[in-house]
């Protein structure tokens, strides 16, 4: 029975991918095209297995080859084969893309949940508002004429206490007293005391 052994990379043995990567590091466009043609199916396949989306896989593969163009000089033939280096770049970039998409999705979920207004029942709100108005009008009827008149001028017409006292030709202290008594009467009538 024979034991399976790992393939051994012999030091300083160069392949044509090694040569192409060195040429890409020197900004050789033709070498980059040749490297791309020879490796794209494996790189794209690795990315697609991680991302499972053809569109994202194409974008990510493009990013990987841009990174290869920019950093081909960092490839060390003693550390492994050119294909292993490319597939490591591909895997890392694909995993980064997955993490980025998940983070974006979580941000959108948090933002969406925080910015969605709860549904409003306009009919129910209108009915409640009409009922509250009716109750206030009924309670206003329980006040004295002087209290009701002072409250109407202040709260419905927007006059200040001084303006109410001038309009009614009454002392400011008297108007304040009528207002306090009227508000107390409204609170009692509305059950807010």
Curated annotation (Swiss-Prot):
InterPro entries: RNA_pol_sigma-70-like (IPR039425), RNA_pol_sigma-70_dom (IPR014284), RNA_pol_sigma70_r2 (IPR007627), RNA_pol_sigma70_r4 (IPR007630), RNA_pol_sigma_r2 (IPR013325), RNA_pol_sigma_r3/r4-like (IPR013324), WH-like_DNA-bd_sf (IPR036388)
Keyword Kinase found: no
Pfam families documented for this protein: Sigma70_r2, Sigma70_r4
DNA-binding region: 161-180
Region (Sigma-70 factor domain-2): 35-101
Statement: the UniProt record of this protein carries the keyword Transcription: yes
Motif (Polymerase core binding): 59-62
Classification via SUPFAM superfamilies: Sigma2 domain of RNA polymerase sigma factors, Sigma3 and sigma4 domains of RNA polymerase sigma factors
Entries under CDD domains matching the protein: Sigma70_r4
Keywords (A to Z) from UniProt: DNA-binding, Sigma factor, Transcription, Transcription regulation
Superkingdom of origin: Bacteria
Chain positions covered by the region annotation Sigma-70 factor domain-4: 140-187
Any Gene Ontology biological process: DNA-templated transcription initiation
Its job: Sigma factors are initiation factors that promote the attachment of RNA polymerase to specific initiation sites and are then released. Extracytoplasmic function (ECF) sigma factors are held in an inactive form by an anti-sigma factor until released by regulated intramembrane proteolysis.
Free-text note on domains in this protein's UniProt record: The sigma-70 factor domain-2 mediates sequence-specific interaction with the -10 element in promoter DNA, and plays an important role in melting the double-stranded DNA and the formation of the transcription bubble. The sigma-70 factor domain-2 mediates interaction with the RNA polymerase subunits RpoB and RpoC.
Other comment: Extracytoplasmic function (ECF) sigma factors are held in an inactive form by an anti-sigma factor until released by regulated intramembrane proteolysis (RIP). RIP occurs when an extracytoplasmic signal triggers a concerted proteolytic cascade to transmit information and elicit cellular responses. The membrane-spanning anti-sigma factor is first cut extracytoplasmically (site-1 protease, S1P), then within the membrane itself (site-2 protease, S2P, Rip1), while cytoplasmic proteases finish degrading the regulatory protein, liberating SigK.
Subunit structure: Interacts transiently with the RNA polymerase catalytic core formed by RpoA, RpoB, RpoC and RpoZ (2 alpha, 1 beta, 1 beta' and 1 omega subunit) to form the RNA polymerase holoenzyme that can initiate transcription. Interacts (via sigma-70 factor domain 4) with anti-sigma-K factor RskA.
Family as reported in the entry's similarity comment: Belongs to the sigma-70 factor family. ECF subfamily.
Protein name: ECF RNA polymerase sigma factor SigK
Gene: sigK
